[in-house]
Design a protein with these regions (language model features):
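Surface-exposed, low-hydrophobicity beta-strand/loop segments enriched in small/polar/acidic residues
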Residues: 1-171
Length: 171
Protein backbone atom coordinates (compact mmCIF):
# COMPACT_ATOMS: atom_id res chain seq x y z
CA UNK A 1 0.00 0.00 0.00
CA UNK A 2 1.10 3.53 -0.74
CA UNK A 3 -0.24 6.14 1.67
CA UNK A 4 -0.94 9.69 0.58
CA UNK A 5 -3.01 10.89 3.57
CA UNK A 6 -3.71 9.42 6.97
CA UNK A 7 -5.33 10.56 10.20
CA UNK A 8 -2.50 11.95 12.38
CA UNK A 9 -2.43 10.18 15.73
CA UNK A 10 -4.72 7.45 14.44
CA UNK A 11 -8.28 6.67 15.50
CA UNK A 12 -10.08 5.05 18.41
CA UNK A 13 -12.13 1.94 17.63
CA UNK A 14 -14.73 0.00 19.60
CA UNK A 15 -13.27 -3.47 20.28
CA UNK A 16 -16.04 -5.25 22.19
CA UNK A 17 -17.93 -6.27 19.03
CA UNK A 18 -14.90 -7.77 17.28
CA UNK A 19 -14.67 -11.56 17.08
CA UNK A 20 -11.03 -11.93 16.09
CA UNK A 21 -7.67 -11.62 17.85
CA UNK A 22 -6.07 -9.24 15.32
CA UNK A 23 -7.31 -6.28 13.32
CA UNK A 24 -5.56 -6.67 9.98
CA UNK A 25 -4.02 -3.91 7.88
CA UNK A 26 -6.42 -2.85 5.13
CA UNK A 27 -9.61 -3.49 7.12
CA UNK A 28 -12.30 -0.88 6.30
CA UNK A 29 -13.42 1.42 9.12
CA UNK A 30 -16.06 4.13 9.43
CA UNK A 31 -17.01 6.88 11.81
CA UNK A 32 -19.42 6.12 14.64
CA UNK A 33 -20.61 8.37 17.48
CA UNK A 34 -18.54 10.82 19.54
CA UNK A 35 -15.44 10.53 17.34
CA UNK A 36 -15.11 6.78 17.86
CA UNK A 37 -14.68 4.61 14.75
CA UNK A 38 -16.06 1.15 14.02
CA UNK A 39 -14.81 -1.76 11.94
CA UNK A 40 -16.83 -2.83 8.90
CA UNK A 41 -16.45 -6.59 9.32
CA UNK A 42 -15.30 -8.44 6.21
CA UNK A 43 -14.48 -12.02 5.22
CA UNK A 44 -13.88 -14.19 2.15
CA UNK A 45 -15.41 -17.55 1.32
CA UNK A 46 -12.96 -20.42 1.75
CA UNK A 47 -14.82 -22.67 -0.70
CA UNK A 48 -17.65 -22.35 -3.19
CA UNK A 49 -20.94 -21.99 -1.29
CA UNK A 50 -24.04 -23.70 -2.69
CA UNK A 51 -27.25 -21.65 -2.97
CA UNK A 52 -29.06 -23.91 -0.47
CA UNK A 53 -26.27 -24.06 2.12
CA UNK A 54 -26.70 -22.49 5.56
CA UNK A 55 -23.01 -23.09 6.33
CA UNK A 56 -20.36 -20.70 5.04
CA UNK A 57 -16.73 -21.75 5.20
CA UNK A 58 -14.76 -18.50 5.47
CA UNK A 59 -11.08 -17.62 5.70
CA UNK A 60 -9.60 -17.15 9.16
CA UNK A 61 -9.09 -13.60 10.44
CA UNK A 62 -12.65 -12.23 10.27
CA UNK A 63 -14.50 -10.55 13.17
CA UNK A 64 -18.05 -11.89 12.69
CA UNK A 65 -20.05 -12.98 15.74
CA UNK A 66 -23.38 -14.75 16.19
CA UNK A 67 -26.15 -12.20 15.66
CA UNK A 68 -24.30 -10.26 12.95
CA UNK A 69 -25.69 -10.05 9.43
CA UNK A 70 -23.39 -10.99 6.55
CA UNK A 71 -23.88 -10.12 2.86
CA UNK A 72 -22.11 -10.20 -0.51
CA UNK A 73 -22.37 -7.96 -3.57
CA UNK A 74 -24.73 -10.54 -5.10
CA UNK A 75 -26.58 -11.67 -1.94
CA UNK A 76 -28.71 -9.88 0.66
CA UNK A 77 -27.58 -10.15 4.27
CA UNK A 78 -28.42 -13.18 6.38
CA UNK A 79 -28.22 -13.47 10.18
CA UNK A 80 -25.37 -15.55 11.61
CA UNK A 81 -26.62 -17.96 14.29
CA UNK A 82 -23.26 -19.52 15.21
CA UNK A 83 -19.53 -19.28 14.55
CA UNK A 84 -17.40 -22.44 14.65
CA UNK A 85 -13.63 -21.79 14.86
CA UNK A 86 -12.55 -25.42 15.48
CA UNK A 87 -10.77 -25.93 12.13
CA UNK A 88 -7.24 -24.59 11.72
CA UNK A 89 -7.90 -23.83 8.03
CA UNK A 90 -11.26 -22.01 8.05
CA UNK A 91 -14.22 -20.97 10.20
CA UNK A 92 -17.83 -22.06 9.67
CA UNK A 93 -20.54 -19.42 9.93
CA UNK A 94 -24.01 -20.96 10.24
CA UNK A 95 -26.78 -18.78 8.83
CA UNK A 96 -30.43 -18.54 9.79
CA UNK A 97 -31.35 -18.78 6.07
CA UNK A 98 -29.19 -19.63 3.01
CA UNK A 99 -28.14 -16.87 0.59
CA UNK A 100 -30.15 -18.52 -2.26
CA UNK A 101 -27.33 -17.81 -4.73
CA UNK A 102 -24.09 -19.68 -5.32
CA UNK A 103 -21.01 -17.85 -4.02
CA UNK A 104 -17.68 -18.65 -5.70
CA UNK A 105 -14.52 -19.32 -3.68
CA UNK A 106 -12.90 -16.08 -2.44
CA UNK A 107 -16.15 -14.08 -2.63
CA UNK A 108 -15.81 -10.91 -0.56
CA UNK A 109 -18.35 -10.72 2.28
CA UNK A 110 -19.26 -7.80 4.54
CA UNK A 111 -21.42 -6.94 7.55
CA UNK A 112 -24.85 -5.61 6.57
CA UNK A 113 -27.55 -3.70 8.46
CA UNK A 114 -29.96 -6.62 8.08
CA UNK A 115 -31.50 -8.62 5.23
CA UNK A 116 -30.09 -6.21 2.65
CA UNK A 117 -26.83 -5.13 1.01
CA UNK A 118 -26.38 -1.94 3.07
CA UNK A 119 -23.05 -1.92 4.95
CA UNK A 120 -23.48 -1.89 8.72
CA UNK A 121 -20.63 0.63 8.91
CA UNK A 122 -20.05 3.00 5.98
CA UNK A 123 -16.27 2.85 5.44
CA UNK A 124 -14.20 6.00 4.96
CA UNK A 125 -10.68 4.70 5.65
CA UNK A 126 -8.52 1.57 5.97
CA UNK A 127 -6.62 0.35 9.04
CA UNK A 128 -2.95 1.31 8.58
CA UNK A 129 -1.26 -1.48 10.59
CA UNK A 130 -2.21 -4.88 11.98
CA UNK A 131 -3.06 -4.58 15.68
CA UNK A 132 -3.84 -6.94 18.55
CA UNK A 133 -7.50 -6.58 19.61
CA UNK A 134 -8.01 -6.09 23.37
CA UNK A 135 -10.88 -8.07 24.92
CA UNK A 136 -12.32 -4.97 26.58
CA UNK A 137 -12.06 -1.25 26.07
CA UNK A 138 -10.93 0.63 23.04
CA UNK A 139 -8.38 0.02 20.33
CA UNK A 140 -6.09 2.68 18.87
CA UNK A 141 -4.75 2.35 15.33
CA UNK A 142 -3.56 4.34 12.34
CA UNK A 143 -6.01 5.01 9.52
CA UNK A 144 -5.41 5.71 5.82
CA UNK A 145 -7.80 8.13 4.15
CA UNK A 146 -6.12 8.41 0.76
CA UNK A 147 -4.01 5.51 -0.52
CA UNK A 148 -3.21 3.11 -3.34
CA UNK A 149 -3.83 -0.57 -2.56
CA UNK A 150 -2.61 -3.64 -4.45
CA UNK A 151 -5.67 -5.90 -4.50
CA UNK A 152 -3.70 -9.16 -4.49
CA UNK A 153 -1.90 -8.13 -1.29
CA UNK A 154 -4.94 -6.77 0.55
CA UNK A 155 -7.96 -8.24 2.28
CA UNK A 156 -10.93 -8.95 -0.02
CA UNK A 157 -13.14 -5.86 -0.06
CA UNK A 158 -16.55 -6.08 -1.73
CA UNK A 159 -17.48 -3.62 -4.47
CA UNK A 160 -20.31 -2.38 -2.24
CA UNK A 161 -17.69 -1.15 0.26
CA UNK A 162 -15.29 0.15 -2.39
CA UNK A 163 -17.99 2.51 -3.64
CA UNK A 164 -17.76 4.31 -0.28
CA UNK A 165 -13.94 4.30 -0.21
CA UNK A 166 -13.74 7.03 -2.87
CA UNK A 167 -10.20 8.10 -1.96
CA UNK A 168 -8.75 4.58 -2.02
CA UNK A 169 -7.46 3.39 -5.39
CA UNK A 170 -7.42 -0.40 -5.84
CA UNK A 171 -4.89 -1.57 -8.48
Amino acid sequence: MHTIADLPGGVTLHSENLGGAYLQVGTPIGKAEKGIYQVEKIAATYTEIRADSKELKVEKGHHFLAGDYIAADIADGQRIVSVNKQSVEYDILTLEQPFSVMLPKQTALFASEGNNKQPKVVPIALVAASTLVPREGELYCGAWLICVVKEKQNLPIAQTLREHLKTVLFV
